[in-house]
Amino acid sequence: MSDTSAASTPAAPAAPLLTTPLHALHIELGAKMVPFGGYDMPVQYATGILAEHRHTRTAAGLFDVSHMGQVLLTGDDAAAALETLVPVDIVDLGPFKQRYALFTNAQGGILDDLMVTRRADDLFVVVNAACKQQDIAHLQQHIGTRCTVQPLPEQALLALQGPQAVTALARLNPEVQKLVFMTGGHFTLAGIGCFVTRSGYTGEDGFEISVPSGQAEQLARALLAQPEVLPIGLGARDTLRLEAGLCLYGHDIDTTTTPVEGALTWAIQKVRRAGGARAGGYPGADVIGAQLAQGANGVQGGVSRKRVGLISTERMPVREGAQVVDAAGAPIGRVTSGSLGPSINQPVALAYLATSHTAIGTEVFAVVRDKRVAMTVAALPFVPNGYFRG
């Protein structure tokens, strides 16, 4: 039966796009704006995605990531409460240390990925833009009686990334040089009180800076005045994170993928696994625990598919959604992210493949416009990380 309702009923108007505190600055800088996560965001500036990507890999790039959600969890029970929603060690996280985490559902699927930093009196949490309203509701519903869940819509978020990021930021406050990867602290930058973590989404050394919205443009201009720094859009952010082998939520991980399938078991600390002092106790713990146990016993990681990196010596980029087949043409998986890797000048991709084909060096084929593109399962990241660990 065909649906004719669309022809007779006017479509509901799309919700107007939100803007970040740097929107006017993006326009001034000549950005090409696109919708992303409900916001009007810069996808690139005049120099283009390739130049922006390479500049970030060699110097320093400034990204507006204010569309992401920032939340404070406050109260003596906050860490233990958060552990009921994530398979991650939060209780033992040291002061001003940061950790990657995952919200899971009852099936072991991933509701979102997030960053958690323990500060003196709270947990500072950053979640993805497209998920932030549901994440805040999730926190309030499940742990809102155990701790205070405080969204921070009045805070902007900037990311300064690249090997020269520390040089540029240290001109505003030399103390930031004391931070190492996945740590944070309170710093005054250009006269503005900020919370800074040494982390990011590019595979490079860099910083993420939470700043009051009303002073975000002042800080952005101070950073752009540094000779190493250029503004970078979401297009290069995507190619940078892909080369770094980092997942994009809603593409490489989602509610149908478990952390084991997503090759994210490194994010589940021993204390939260079977035999650990605080094993389980989070949504989907039975599913994820069983997959971990089977993997430990050599049963193909306990899953039938797994996320891997793919690299090709051919020139044709392989995009999200491309089917992956074996030498006989039998389907074995699908690409979830793909692009030319500007740093290595070869097509790279993330894909879920049958575990029988996930060994490093396995040759597979991506189907692009009915043509088979030879690809090889490769170790991640595709480009060495530049994180500063001290």
Predicted regions mapped to residue ranges:
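Acidic, proline/glycine-enriched N-terminal capping motif
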Residues: 1-101, 109, 234
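A generic structural motif
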Residues: 74, 104-106, 325, 367
